[in-house]
Amino acid sequence: MPDHDSTALLSRQTKRRRVDIGVKRTVGTASAFFAKARATFFSAMNPQGSEQDVEYSVVQHADGEKPNVLRKLLKRANSYEDAMMPFPGATIISQLLKNNMNKNGGTEPSFQASGLSSTGSEVHQEDVCSNSSRDSPQECLSPFGRPTMSQFDVDRLCDEHLRAKRARVENIIRGMSHSPRVALRGNENEREIRPQSVSPRESYRENKRKQNWPQQQQQSFQQLVSARKEQKREERRQLKQQLEDMQKQLRQLQEEFYQIYDSTDSENDEDGNLSEDRMRSETVDAQAGDSVGRSDNEMCELDPGQFIDRARALIREQEIGENKPKREGPKEKDQGPNSFHPEGKHLAETLKQELNTAMSQVVDTVVKVFSSKPSRQLPQVFPPLQIPQARFAVNGENHNFHTANQRLQCFGDVIIPNPLDTFSSVPMPGATDQTDALPLVVRKNSSDQPASAPPAGGHHASLHQSPLSATAGFSTSSFRHPFPLPLMAYPFQSPLGAPSASFPGKERASPESLDLTRETTSLRTKMSSHHMNHHPCSPAHPPSAAEGLSLSLIKSECGDLQDMSEISPYSGSAMQEGLSPNHLKKAKLMFFYTRYPSSNMLKTYFSDVKFNRCITSQLIKWFSNFREFYYIQMEKYARQAINDGVTSTEELSITRDCELYRALNMHYNKANDFEVPERFLEVAQITLREFFNAIIAGKDVDPSWKKAIYKVICKLDSEVPEIFKSPNCLQELLHE
């Protein structure tokens, strides 16, 4: 029995060592080999044999040879025990076998390592056993049937063991990269042979090898993904930065374009200022003519609501026409946040002036409508009369002066009604009432008119008998214009700028004599707005007190003026806040002497104007427009001369008979009532030749080719005569 147990233990030990090494082998060959080895051991241990031993035995051995075979196996097992101990797969199993042998009493300890085998030796032995033609049972019986192994066989066994482990690792790696279960599913024989109980250390190492590769692969993949994301993020940031830069450049281009466009627009507006003023005055005259053509009954049938609506419509039309001049003010103001306060005041002043201008034009239109009717209806009662100087009495203490003021105040209150006024309780007067009140408005007898003013109470009572004022509830304290004489068809001056002593009644009523520009009415409008702000209308004021307030306002506005004749816009002691057509004509005549005037020169020669930034800018723009027309004509005629075949500048000359001179004189001296100085002809000739030389030399291809010509012409200005410093210079020049 002990021999039988030892044989079985040796068989199990051999099988386990083969499995731990991991050698692949076929089931049939291995089974046959183990069956033969088992039969051999059983026959050696049991001489008598048995039926079971006979079944597994293939070759019968002699009784004398059985102990030799067993001795050889034990000897070889003892010699290989030390050689197999370094292998990791044999450590645990060898210790288990030693423990098992110790438990059995230490008998036959040499069997613990007798099951050593390897892939190369077993396969080689199986091939030799199957292919050999020899009948020797020693060679086919078992792997231990050979004589003692040499050192070369031991080294070869170690190399084969290492190659087997390397092949196993490569197989595991290939399985992990493709399909981890392919090898196990495809090799069922190996799975059947491999035991279920594998050592814990081997299992841990296999798991570690299987886990290392996917973790490294996953980390590399994550690094690749993160690098890709970082690259995309960087590209996105660069694109965003480029987009922001392009947006900044676009905004800069837009700002430059708007600046150029605004400057061009402002120049075009300045070129058309004079024509706009002329068209505006013609429009007002046309409206006045249409209104004059209406019948008296139609005017009498207007109720207060319709009258106010019509007046407000006129105001809106005038404000629409003034939009462009209003826009020029804010362009100069929006230069910086630090200069908001003073330029904001300037903007408010300009806006107030423009609104007052529109208001004054509406008042003029309404006054002309109502003042033209008496001249048509009563020509035989009111013949053409001379305007005496007595009507310009000291401090305005004149009956007709106050009647005119009363008349103007009535129409002013119609345009801007007092919120306290009511029209529901008092009806408008009829045609008969207006006919009775007309003598109080326009009647004047020069032969009986005293030079001194009547008592205050006498004319106050007569003033407030006006049906349009008293019946409609208009307050006299809302005095609109302290100087309404030009609005009453009695202009201060002639077209030449001198005060006129007499005008026929027909001329007085004509639209031309009533045409007032924006500049001449700005002073009166500003003064009236001052009265409206500081002296609001109050129904509690009695008529006498209201009239006295009006007189005091006139005196306060006049200041130290002792005579009403000094209110003339072109008198030396009165200051204007606006520019008139006479100022424009004066500037055109000054252009014959100076093309580039300074602001100080303008203040010296326009002493009757109260200068501010707007006035100075307007005058400078006038001269800029003059120069532009001048240079355009010079370039035009220079090119025309080149086309005509002129080759030398000596052939170019300007005389008073040439076409270029006539064009310039028609623009700057339209009435041809001023003798152009000879110096201007010389300057014009030099300018023409400069343009001719520049065009011949091909300098006109440069956008700034005219700047060189400008530098030459600006040095040719001459002294302006002293007579231009006088406010009445136009009259004096024409009389000379």
Swiss-Prot record:
Pfam families: HPD. GO terms for cellular component: cytoplasm; nucleus. Residues 450-460 have a biased composition (Low complexity). Residues 576-734 are annotated as: Homeo-Prospero. Belongs to the Prospero homeodomain family. PANTHER family: HOMEOBOX PROTEIN PROSPERO/PROX-1/CEH-26 (PTHR12198), PROSPERO HOMEOBOX PROTEIN 1 (PTHR12198:SF6). This is Prospero homeobox protein 1. It comes from Gallus gallus.
